[in-house]
């Protein structure tokens, strides 16, 4: 009997389910056009065999561990934030259990999401207005009107002030935002991401209700949080997420990376390789910059697919939400940082200060350093994100 050809190469056949790439079936590639994967030598063991086992980099690993200690909040700050979040959550759950005590809106459930839940929170950069924050998704049974959200904020502020000492009441403030509510208490903040049940989305009016796209985004945050809890459990993943978040807040070119994209990129870099073992933080960090530099999120690239999209019908490539200028800025910024990492790793990771390498030619650790330049500008992208067909046409023009 003729043996059937294995679908995957031998090194991928026994891969655990959580390490599978989130890619649609190969037939989907033909339907989408000439999209392609970026160069990644770790997934090409036949052409680029490893000369040695991937162990921790003796130079980069101590620098990464030192930076992680600087980015991690102190035990006192973490306890204070957890105490503040617990108080807010208790007040919200009280409204869930006794809906008749508050008639402006009815709460269905409250869920923890974000960096504080996943233990990947970092200290805000010096001089920024940011605070240590925790996120809670509040799902309403009723429609999220602006008036109801404001009344919910006033009720929470009143209930919290009843438990505070007189000197603590002045620190508590609450304000309405485009995503819901923000409760601030000195150097800490709790963001309430308001949304409603999916059955109510089609009835939302942007003039009186919270924006429909924002409601969907806040609701999807609960799915993302569950996925991260179940899949991103390796310590290297949490370390890489912290490092990427730190790079994003220090370098303007990495701002297009949102938290969900950072989690997917970190998971891909740590787990998706030619073995069943996870990469150490030093190699995973360099691999993240290498993939971004190779054009992982440029037009025509397969990029990273959303695990919650329908892969059989309409697989969603996450980088298509960016404008072409943002995609180009993300690529050339990563290329510049990757070259700087080889010259002065302590500067890239934030351990030591140095010149602004994106301002122009400079001396970096005794080496003349010239940054990469953009090839797409704002007037060319018009500030609009490109869909898959538009990005495919741009890909064809570049390669023609």
Where are these regions (language model features)?
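Catalytic cores of NTP-dependent nucleotidyl/adenyl transfer enzymes across multiple folds
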Residues: 86, 93, 146-306
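Compositionally biased, intrinsically disordered low-complexity segments enriched
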Residues: 15, 21-36, 234, 250, ...
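Intrinsic structural disorder
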Residues: 1-3, 12-22, 101, 133, ...
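Charged, low-complexity, helix-prone segments enriched in Lys/Glu/Asp/Gln
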Residues: 78-81, 85-86, 215-230, 325, ...
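Pol beta-like nucleotidyltransferase catalytic core
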Residues: 259, 263-400
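Generic detection of intrinsically disordered/low-complexity segments and helix-coil linkers/edges
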Residues: 5, 33-35, 221, 254, ...
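N-terminal regions immediately upstream of nucleotidyltransferase
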Residues: 1-132, 138-155, 169-173, 178-182, ...
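Compositionally biased, low-structure terminal segments
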Residues: 9, 30, 40-42, 49, ...
């Amino acid at each position: 009997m003729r043996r059937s050809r294995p679908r995957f190469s031998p090194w991928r056949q026994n891969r655990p389910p959580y390490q599978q790439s989130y890619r649609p079936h190969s037939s989907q590639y033909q339907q989408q056009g000439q999209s392609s994967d970026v160069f990644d030598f770790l997934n090409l063991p036949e052409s680029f065999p490893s000369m040695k086992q991937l162990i921790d980099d003796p130079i980069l690993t101590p620098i990464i561990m030192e930076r992680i200690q600087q980015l991690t909040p102190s035990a006192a700050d973490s306890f204070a934030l957890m105490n503040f979040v617990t108080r807010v959550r208790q007040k919200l759950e009280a409204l869930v259990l006794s809906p008749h005590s508050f008639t402006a809106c009815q709460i269905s459930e409250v869920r923890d999401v974000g960096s504080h839940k996943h233990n990947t929170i970092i200290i805000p950069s010096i001089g920024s207005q940011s605070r240590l924050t925790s996120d809670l998704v509040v799902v309403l049974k009723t429609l999220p009107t602006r008036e109801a959200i404001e009344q919910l904020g006033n009720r929470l502020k009143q209930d919290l002030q009843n438990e505070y000492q007189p000197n603590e009441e002045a620190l508590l403030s609450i304000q309405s935002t485009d995503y819901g509510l923000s409760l601030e208490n000195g150097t800490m903040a709790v963001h309430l991401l308001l949304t409603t049940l999916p059955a109510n989305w089609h009835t939302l009016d942007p003039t009186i209700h919270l924006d429909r796209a924002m409601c969907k985004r806040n609701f999807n945050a609960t799915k993302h949080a569950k996925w991260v809890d179940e899949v991103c459990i390796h310590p290297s993943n949490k370390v890489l997420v912290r490092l990427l978040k730190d790079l994003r807040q220090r370098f303007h070119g990495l701002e297009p990376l949102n938290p969900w994209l950072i989690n997917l990129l970190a998971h891909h870099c740590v787990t998706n390789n030619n073995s069943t073992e996870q990469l150490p933080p030093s190699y995973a960090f360099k691999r993240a910059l290498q993939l971004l530099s190779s054009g992982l999120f440029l037009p025509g690239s397969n990029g990273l697919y959303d695990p919650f999209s329908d892969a059989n019908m309409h697989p969603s490539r996450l980088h298509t939400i960016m404008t072409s200028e943002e995609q180009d800025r993300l690529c050339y910024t990563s290329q510049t940082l990757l070259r700087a990492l080889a010259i002065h790793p302590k500067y890239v990771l934030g351990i030591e200060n140095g010149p602004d390498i994106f301002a122009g030619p400079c001396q970096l650790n005794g080496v003349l350093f010239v940054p990469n330049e953009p090839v797409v500008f704002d007037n060319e992208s018009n500030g609009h994100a490109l869909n898959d067909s538009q990005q495919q046409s741009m890909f064809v023009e570049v390669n023609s």
